């Protein structure tokens, strides 16, 4: 009768059976070349610099973490959120001051991404983080 060839009744050819070629897990990660990634970061930073939405912050003014002081700095500057704050790893007071503000993203230069720079309407970089940001966006490879 051919019944033995069919296998189980849960095989794809039977009603109520499985799916022959179901959708599987798929990774949508895309590899971007290092030079292209750096060029994109340079372009995004240049855009902020040209539009006047890039500010350099003196981290020394934050002796202790103060969200109130951080909010005052942003209000004094007068730029709309969202804001990206790039601070050096050692500037813990700045990181703690800005991290609790709404629509403010705080990151370190080693984790700076093009998407975050493009997302932000304003960019604040501390003096300690500025050389590291320049190095990350530079044309030459960094060690």
Predicted features by range, described:
Residues 22-143:
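Extended polybasic, low-complexity segments that bind anionic RNA or targeting/receptor surfaces
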Residues 1-21:
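Glycine/serine-rich anion-binding loops at beta->alpha junctions
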């Amino acid at each position: 009768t051919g019944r033995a060839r069919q296998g189980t009744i849960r095989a794809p050819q039977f009603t109520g059976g499985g799916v022959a070629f179901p959708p599987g897990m798929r990774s949508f990660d895309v590899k971007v070349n290092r030079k292209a990634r750096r060029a994109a970061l340079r372009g995004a930073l240049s855009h902020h610099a040209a539009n006047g939405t890039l500010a350099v912050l003196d981290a020394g003014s934050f002796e202790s973490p103060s969200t109130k002081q951080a909010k005052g700095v942003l209000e004094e500057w007068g730029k709309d959120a969202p804001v990206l704050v790039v601070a050096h790893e050692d500037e813990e007071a700045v990181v703690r001051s800005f991290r609790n503000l709404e629509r403010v993203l705080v990151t370190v230069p080693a984790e700076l991404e093009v998407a975050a720079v493009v997302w932000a309407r304003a960019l604040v970089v501390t003096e300690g983080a500025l050389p590291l940001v320049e190095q990350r966006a530079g044309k030459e490879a960094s060690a």
